[in-house]
Amino acid sequence: MTTLTHRARRTEISKNSEKKMESEEDSNWEKSPDNEDSGDSKDIRLTLMEEVLLLGLKDKEGYTSFWNDCISSGLRGGILIELAMRGRIYLEPPTMRKKRLLDRKVLLKSDSPTGDVLLDETLKHIKATEPTETVQTWIELLTGETWNPFKLQYQLRNVRERIAKNLVEKGILTTEKQNFLLFDMTTHPVTNTTEKQRLVKKLQDSVLERWVNDPQRMDKRTLALLVLAHSSDVLENVFSSLTDDKYDVAMNRAKDLVELDPEVEGTKPSATEMIWAVLAAFNKS
């Protein structure tokens, strides 16, 4: 009986320890310098997906460019990075047969809810999937780009609209109906331009005034956002307000950053592997 009691206590301590780690990871995300704003936006916390969509939206029109066919997969990549940064998923450790980022499978670390519907829906898919899948495969599955009819169940639907509704609830966007000749479309114009400008300036500064020329020394969420903005084809929107000289510098530095070898960067001591795995997936696609 004593042994069983001790074993039960050890199990309880282990579970409590895991919950504490998850709580600390979520707390660290909330307290990240990247999530601390000034002025009116000090209480606003945005996910990477929300930031990418906000950067891609036309302020007054409230929709993304009709010619942008990259943002859907970019948002799915953002979901994977967000889950990894919150301690919910990770890449399996490298082995002799699986050294490359794109060969290694995405594993579940914790199925504890994040409070975000899209993140939690993805988490359920990852938990329920056997055998496990790679980062590139997950981006394809979540986007619905699969020829396997049995895997269409993993597609996340209405992602842009759901993210936009989150931004409406956070007071950054509003909802309107616009008529486009033959059909009506729901749009989400930006109402909190201060928050969007803060986001734009943060990215501009990261490749100009605060440029460190080393991704390992960059704030991880800023690095992730630069990678996702590039992969989602919205980086042009970020730098469009700069003078010609600064625009050229910013674009060249961002280009140098995303052209680094993900396999090399992902093995460095302080690297967040999921960021580089997502970049590698987009570079290959």
Swiss-Prot record:
Q: Does the keyword Translocase apply?
A: no
Q: Which domain of life is it from?
A: Eukaryota
Q: Does the keyword Ribonucleoprotein apply?
A: no
One Pfam family name from the record? GPP34
Compartment(s) where it occurs, according to its Swiss-Prot or TrEMBL record: Golgi apparatus, Golgi stack membrane; Golgi apparatus, trans-Golgi network membrane
Residues bound to a 1,2-diacyl-sn-glycero-3-phospho-(1D-myo-inositol 4-phosphate) are: W67, R76, R157, R160
Q: Where is this region: Disordered?
A: 1-42
Membrane topology term:
Peripheral membrane protein
Q: Where is this region: Beta-hairpin required for oligomerization?
A: 176-187
Q: Which keywords does this chain's UniProt record carry?
A: Golgi apparatus, Lipid-binding, Membrane, Phosphoprotein
Recorded GO cellular component terms are: cytosol; Golgi apparatus; Golgi cisterna; Golgi cisterna membrane; Golgi membrane; trans-Golgi network; trans-Golgi network membrane
A GO molecular function annotation here is: phosphatidylinositol-4-phosphate binding
For bias type Basic and acidic residues, the affected ranges are: 10-42
GO biological process terms, semicolon-separated: Golgi organization; Golgi to plasma membrane protein transport; Golgi vesicle budding; positive regulation of protein secretion; protein targeting to Golgi apparatus; retrograde vesicle-mediated transport, Golgi to endoplasmic reticulum
| Phosphoserine PTM sites in chain numbering | S112
The annotated subunit structure for this chain is: Homooligomer. Does not interact MYO18; differs from GOLPH3 by its inability to interact with MYO18. May interact with ARF1.
**Family that this chain belongs to:** Belongs to the GOLPH3/VPS74 family.
So what does this one do? Phosphatidylinositol-4-phosphate-binding protein that may antagonize the action of GOLPH3 which is required for the process of vesicle budding at the Golgi and anterograde transport to the plasma membrane.
**Name recorded for this polypeptide:** Golgi phosphoprotein 3-like
Per UniProt, what is the name of the gene that codes for the protein in this document? GOLPH3L
